[in-house]
Amino acid sequence: MKQEGSARRRGADKAKPPPGGEQEPPPPAPQDVEMKEEAAAGSGSTGEGDGKAAATEHSQRELDTVTLEDIKEHVRQLEKAVSGKEPRFVLRALRMLPSTSRRLNHYVLYKAVHGFFTSNNATRDFLLPFLEEPMDTEADLQFRPRTGKAASAPLLPEVEAYLQLLMVIFLMNSKRYKEAQKISDDLMQKISTQNRRALDLVAAKCYYYHARVYEFLDKLDVVRSFLHARLRTATLRHDADGQATLLNLLLRNYLHYSLYDQAEKLVSKSVFPEQANNNEWARYLYYTGRIKAIQLEYSEARRTMTNALRKAPQHTAVGFKQTVHKLLIVVELLLGEIPDRLQFRQPSLKRSLMPYFLLTQAVRTGNLAKFNQVLDQFGEKFQTDGTYTLIIRLRHNVIKTGVRMISLSYSRISLADIAQKLQLDSPEDAEFIVAKAIRDGVIEASINHEKGYVQSKEMIDIYSTREPQLAFHQRISFCLDIHNMSVKAMRFPPKSYNKDLESAEERREREQQDLEFAKEMAEDDDDSFP
């Protein structure tokens, strides 16, 4: 208790102000301590940020090293293709082009141009201004793929075209289309002067990206004459890959400006090479399907677009498959068929096909009001997809479907009620539409013009008609087409492979000779014994 009392007195003494009215200075504010702690924490976070930046830079340098080694390997494949006259090595290099193009940057291309263009100073000086010169660091990569005598040897045209193509792709991905156009024009000028079969595959890729550059610049009409000239040259040289690529580029060019007649003439006057790869075949079938759809050949359009989906890659090219599905759905609706609901439920297609799903529902039910609502809501999207013109034609199909639904529901109905249900202007319009539906075989009915009503006839047994037979024929033809296309897509050994193989008759003769020789040997062995 005494200790507690003394402690209280000491506390009271400390609480009293000092003599003279002066007070002790207040203790330092705790904010100063907090600011110091925050500063220390800030310096620590800055250190961590620097460490992360250094780690990121190190990983980027490693990725650049791998990319340069890949480019070096692709160049080696091109050189092997030229020396061995084997185009499959060029295909190996071009097959990795999408993966390589995603990893390109200023540093990689600067090192590649400096490393490969050792003897061709003019091309090197032309390409380097389009790239930013990297800063010299201690960890800078020394990339010298050509040393010794190879450094002074001229670069192969295939390798030079491949490296310039990488530059064009990089500038396109960077949205520097004007600069990409300059390099691509220079590349086309060099390719046009060459006549080398090993260059054909690389040139086909160059044509594709050359047209893409002009498409981004909205100058596709400028490049059309050049593509025609290269198509003539590729056809005369039997360059299948170049011919397929150029045909597709010209069709895309015509369809971009809605020149369907010129596109149809090009398709009819040219032959698409059978040796073309599946990707080019898929593009060609899609373009021809669009042409056939515009020209009212809906059955042929559906066939070609179904084949285009079959030729397309199964797990990639999602955008291409979405585009084909949009047009295919509209064509099937124009044919009077309703697309399968599972088609709209695929995860990769569900979102993009939603407007077309609503359109299909409107056509299936024959609801003209809902059809007009979908058209008003998604009209701009349909125009962007290039299907708006075909969808406008669906209005008559919607009306026909509505007439058929009314005919199935009512044995007799007045023309005024039909006009009201179909949202037509007058009963006379309904009379014309019903008369046309009867003439086209959409419904089985008769019109009483005096009393103004439609009398539906009794339904006949559909199995007594030819419709089931035609449906089975269509399915069987589809299966046979799949079988024939699968056989064509298979790889078979060359004909020279059979030269070294003996026929069945030759094999029998050889076996007979072996048996006779064995008998003679046995007789000789028997004679050798006394």
Curated annotation (Swiss-Prot):
It comes from the Eukaryota. The keyword Ubl conjugation applies. Residues 17-30 have a biased composition (Pro residues). GO terms for cellular component: cytosol; nucleoplasm; proteasome accessory complex; proteasome regulatory particle. The keyword Ubl conjugation applies. Keywords: Isopeptide bond, Phosphoprotein, Proteasome, Tumor antigen, Ubl conjugation. Component of the 19S proteasome regulatory particle complex. The 26S proteasome consists of a 20S core particle (CP) and two 19S regulatory subunits (RP). The regulatory particle is made of a lid composed of 9 subunits including PSMD3, a base containing 6 ATPases and few additional components. Interacts with UBQLN1 (via ubiquitin-like domain). Interacts with ERCC6. This is 26S proteasome non-ATPase regulatory subunit 3.
